[in-house]
Amino acid sequence: MSKRKIFYSFHFDNDVMRVQLVRNMGVIEGNEPVSPNTWEEIKRKGKSAIEKWIDDNMAGKSCVIVLIGEETHKRPWVLYEMKKAWADGKGLLGIHIHNLKCARNGTCKKGVDPFSQITFKIGEKIVFPKVYDPKPTDAYNDISNNLSTWVEAAIKQSSGS
């Protein structure tokens, strides 16, 4: 099976180093991170520019992975990305990344599940996108060994299967 194209959603300032660990696993094909300078430039252009950037970068992706750090649930653009992914019929899942070690800050506290802030439906049926909490003793390998399976399950769920 070919690698799925993935859009990663996360809290840039707090979690970019942990996110890089996941991206560099090479298990799936993810979007390239935006540089801090580019992101600041996009933000200065306002809400519609941010939405356009997200929409453009999410296009062509089959799944959105929300990498959940300590404060991810507070980020309005993460919530926008989750809603957009679901509305577009993309696979959607979350992974707690608090036990991945950041080179600067080590690990962090487990964050609140941002999926609890949104109701997801297929037709009239309420569904719950899966949120994974990797083993605290070996989070990196747990994610690496299971990521492609988790992505396939999320894509299957979003299609109503």
What are the residue ranges of the model-derived segments?
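C-terminal interaction surface of TIR/SEFIR-family domains
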Residues: 1-7, 18, 103-161
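Conserved nucleotide-binding/hydrolysis micro-motifs of P-loop NTPases
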Residues: 13-15, 99-102
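Short, glycine/charged-enriched secondary-structure capping and boundary segments
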Residues: 21-24, 79-82, 107-109
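Short, low-complexity, polar/charged sequence segments that are solvent-exposed and flexible
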Residues: 26-29, 84-87, 113-114
